């Protein structure tokens, strides 16, 4: 056990010391425009939730049916309250709510384990050869992949209207209606700053854990072209923001 702890500490230190992975990809011409450490396998944190959403939507469940929220992990949704599956997906993609992700995984007809198997099968089918998903929220540092894998995931996710439209909602409300007086919960996007700065973002998902650092995956549409921008392992929120701004202003917008 002590050896395992030491190894995990060494791995975490290596992730923290390494430079961030940065990828800019032109999805219109299928061209990699910028690649920095894009083949490094590292934790992806809540970017995981994009795959969770795709896997759940594949089930074809009635999104207006209600389920009770799972409260075994952190989240803003109220304990022992029922929300529609649609509301859970919104809370997960916009607010990055972990309890929503766990609730959706456990809503699989055959349980959470079957859902995780479906997630990993989908990743392999898409060609995410270096990715593995241990949980549906991204809290686990065993959820790993490369920037190139995440690009592959985004190529699939951008074709799903629900994910595309929901992930860029800046702010909305969800009401817990099980009580006599409904309790309204404000759901604000975890990427509100960049969404306000760049109105060309059409898909967005952030991620943050100590092992993963500050992460973000974006799809932008500019000048009739579609671009994917992935940052993994930035040391701070401000550093992540500066990387995104540098790539958009100095790389993407300088293209012919």
Segments and roles (model prediction):
Residues 3-12:
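Sec-dependent N-terminal signal peptides
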Residues 17-21, 88, 110-256:
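Penicillin-recognizing serine hydrolase domain
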């Amino acid at each position: 056990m002590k050896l395992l702890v030491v190894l995990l500490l060494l791995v975490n230190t290596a992730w923290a010391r390494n430079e961030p992975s940065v990828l800019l990809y032109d999805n219109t011409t299928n061209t990699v425009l910028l690649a920095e450490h894009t083949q490094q396998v590292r934790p992806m944190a809540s970017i995981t939730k994009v795959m969770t959403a795709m896997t759940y939507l594949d089930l074809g469940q009635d999104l207006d049916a209600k389920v009770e929220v799972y409260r075994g992990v952190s989240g803003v949704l109220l304990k022992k309250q029922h929300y529609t599956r649609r509301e859970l997906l919104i809370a997960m993609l916009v607010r990055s709510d972990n309890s929503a992700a766990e609730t959706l995984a456990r809503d699989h007809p055959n349980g959470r384990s079957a859902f995780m198997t479906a997630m990993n099968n989908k990743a392999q089918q898409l060609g995410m050869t270096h990715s593995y998903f241990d949980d549906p929220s991204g809290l686990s540092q065993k959820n790993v992949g490369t920037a190139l894998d995440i690009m592959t995931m985004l190529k699939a996710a951008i074709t799903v209207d629900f994910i595309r439209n929901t992930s860029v909602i800046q702010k909305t409300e969800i009401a817990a209606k099980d009580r006599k007086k409904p309790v309204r919960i404000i759901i604000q996007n975890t990427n509100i700053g960049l969404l306000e700065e760049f109105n060309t973002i059409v898909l967005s998902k952030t991620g943050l854990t100590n092992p993963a650092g500050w992460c973000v995956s974006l799809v932008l549409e500019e000048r009739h072209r579609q671009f994917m921008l992935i940052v993994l392992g930035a040391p701070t929120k401000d550093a992540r923001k500066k990387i995104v701004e540098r790539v958009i202003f100095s790389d993407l917008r300088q293209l012919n």
